[in-house]
A protein has these predicted regions:
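Membrane-cytosol interface segments
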Residues: 1-128, 386-412
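Histidine- and acidic-residue-rich, metal-dependent catalytic cores
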Residues: 98-412
Length: 412
């Protein structure tokens, strides 16, 4: 039986199923093993992780009566939290996703090339081309205004090799969407986008063999990676009239509200609004993307994981606004409908976060592919609903991304 417990309850002999936190910030590159080495237990205790999942069927259990949350209880808590932000009208996108996707693909390609150039300039000690960066943010912001789901979802289709560059584009787009959801003015929204674009500039000077290492990082290597906010801040300071918001997000996007983040261990209101926004956007893109050491999670699953971590990692109000901007089932999420059909979310609708447009293509009743059909769940009068999310790894649909994007592969 899976149980979520505090790391303080963790003992040798327990089967460590999963960490309650982003995999970039715990001391292991794998999970799903029995803790037998005292040094491994010490490493978990010394990390910023506060809770873990254990499997009591494969290892020791917590003591009778000890506090623990079952998988069903945790899921109910998360769904209840997401339900709180699901009601209410959404602003409908002016342009359908299908029409914006082609234009967004070109912006992603241009964006990746621009970020590559920025990183190369930074490595040589040159100031970032602020004018070029602002023009790119303007392009991305305009695309998000036309249809936020298009570019944000496309930018997720990065490979492990181009992750660092496309991650900057993706976080920029999500920062813009989140700023709009929070009601920030146009100037603040563009600044938030610029901060997202440049937040990881410090990775330009991280050793490639460490940045792209497919296995567990040593303590020394992890310390190197954790230096990238400070290094990026130094690089940005080379420029003239750099927006303070950009500097702030670059330096503090790995801070957590409980004080367990880095580089300064800030907590609560010590962290600015914009750095809190950056933290949410950064983690979401990281855990939904394929990395050298791990495949990305499904978008809907990722939001639910982040909801589990909200109390320690994120500002709850910022996270709720992020969910509103993305949808409870973001574009690209694999879902099962009450009819037994499986489909992929292709667009959000204005009515509710729980009634997106879904392209169904598989029947669980016949266990066969069916002719793809787009269903707007906001117009079914409740006769068809999302019954739950599905694990893409279980079904292994090789064309899942093509089904929602219309593109056979990422064009960058």
């Amino acid at each position: 039986m899976l149980k979520r417990i505090s790391v303080q309850q963790l003992t040798l002999g327990m089967h460590l199923k999963e960490f309650c936190g982003s995999w970039m910030e715990h001391p292991f590159w794998r999970t799903g093993f029995v803790l037998t080495n005292p040094k491994d237990l010490e490493a978990v205790m010394a990390s910023s992780i506060k809770e873990v999942w254990i499997d009591s069927d494969k290892g020791l259990d917590v003591a009778a009566g000890a506090p623990a949350v079952s998988e069903a209880e945790s899921e109910a808590q998360v769904e209840a939290e997401l339900k709180q932000v699901s009601d209410g009208q959404r602003q409908i996108a002016p342009i359908p996703a299908a029409l914006e996707l082609q234009r967004a693909a070109k912006i992603c390609l241009h964006g990746k090339q621009a970020v590559v150039s920025m990183f190369e300039e930074a490595r040589m000690g040159k100031a970032v081309d602020g004018g070029g960066a602002r023009l790119l943010v303007e392009e991305i912001s305009d695309s998000v205004s036309r249809n936020p789901g298009a570019l944000i979802s496309l930018a997720r289709l990065k490979t492990a090799d181009d992750y660092t560059y496309m991650h900057s584009v993706a976080v920029c787009a999500m920062m813009v969407a989140l700023a709009k959801q929070l009601g920030l003015d146009e100037a603040q929204t563009r600044s938030a986008g610029l901060a997202g674009l440049l937040h990881d500039l410090g990775k330009a000077v991280m050793p490639a063999e460490v940045l792209n290492k497919p296995g567990k990082l040593t303590d020394a290597e992890f310390a190197i990676i954790k230096s990238h906010p400070v290094e990026g801040h130094k690089m940005l300071m080379v420029g003239v009239n750099v927006d303070p918001m950009v500097l702030d997000v670059c330096l503090h996007h790995h801070e957590k509200v409980d004080g367990s983040g880095y580089p300064k261990g800030l907590k609560g209101d010590e962290i600015s609004l914009y750095a809190k926004m950056g933290a949410v956007c950064d983690v979401y893109d990281a855990i939904t993307s394929n990395r050298p050491y791990k495949s990305g999670w499904d978008p809907a699953e990722s939001l639910r994981k982040m909801a589990e971590w909200t109390n320690g990692h994120f500002d709850p109000k910022i996270f709720q606004a992020f969910v509103k901007s993305m949808g409870i089932y973001p574009v690209g999420s694999l879902v099962r409908l009450t009819s037994g059909r499986i489909g992929v979310v292709i667009e959000q609708t204005a009515k509710s976060l729980t009634t997106p447009c879904v392209k169904v293509f598989f029947s669980t009743k016949s266990n066969m592919r069916i002719v793809p059909q787009v269903i707007d769940l906001s117009r079914t009068d409740g006769t068809e609903k999302i019954a739950g999310r599905e694990d893409p790894a279980k079904w292994r649909f090789s064309d899942l991304n093509e089904l929602w994007s219309g593109l056979p592969k990422a064009p960058w």
